UniProtKB/Swiss-Prot annotation:
Protein name per the record: Probable HTH-type transcriptional regulator TtgR
Keyword Cell membrane: no
Gene this chain is encoded by: ttgR
Location of the DNA-binding region in this protein: 33-52
An annotated Gene Ontology molecular function: transcription cis-regulatory region binding
The entry's keywords: DNA-binding, Repressor, Transcription, Transcription regulation
Superkingdom in the source lineage: Bacteria
PROSITE patterns noted in UniProt: HTH_TETR_1, HTH_TETR_2
Annotated organism of origin: Pseudomonas putida (strain ATCC 47054 / DSM 6125 / CFBP 8728 / NCIMB 11950 / KT2440)
Domain (HTH tetR-type): residue spans on this chain: 10-70
Chain's role: Probable regulatory protein for the ttgABC efflux pump operon. May function as a repressor.
Amino acid sequence: MVRRTKEEAQETRAQIIEAAERAFYKRGVARTTLADIAELAGVTRGAIYWHFNNKAELVQALLDSLHETHDHLARASESEDELDPLGCMRKLLLQVFNELVLDARTRRINEILHHKCEFTDDMCEIRQQRQSAVLDCHKGITLALANAVRRGQLPGELDVERAAVAMFAYVDGLIGRWLLLPDSVDLLGDVEKWVDTGLDMLRLSPALRK
């Protein structure tokens, strides 16, 4: 009985997340209410509050779902024991771009995060949440780049802090550009070129040296 109740709770949580995704995609995060999400999910607002305190936690759940399939590669590139951290980063970026183009749900969630998540005054918690996510991502990229430097895959004089900012900006900007103008960039056909462009920047740019 306990197991069944737990499974039902997990199913309800998944329903709520799916409904939030649909509502955010249609209306934007700021214009969507928890009542809108409850109606789409076929649950009460009380059921939503059982799983999530506010919209910020729902946005975080969507963001977490994006990271699930990439987590093992991210952890590998950040590990000091990994022999090929730059190779793991390359595989990770290829996976990120391929999923963006080929998986409709991944595309919708990225669309929400990039173009439908307004940082208005009443959305300050979501702004803080996104700031924290960017800083966490920066920390992970910095660790991966430092590992690649130690393994001789990147220049010893690479400024890993500055390089991490540049790499995040490159990837995030390319995703945002493709979402806005998908026909202007062959992200799938040229995916290896786009990834290697970013990695070449790390290897070759004098401006990223100490």
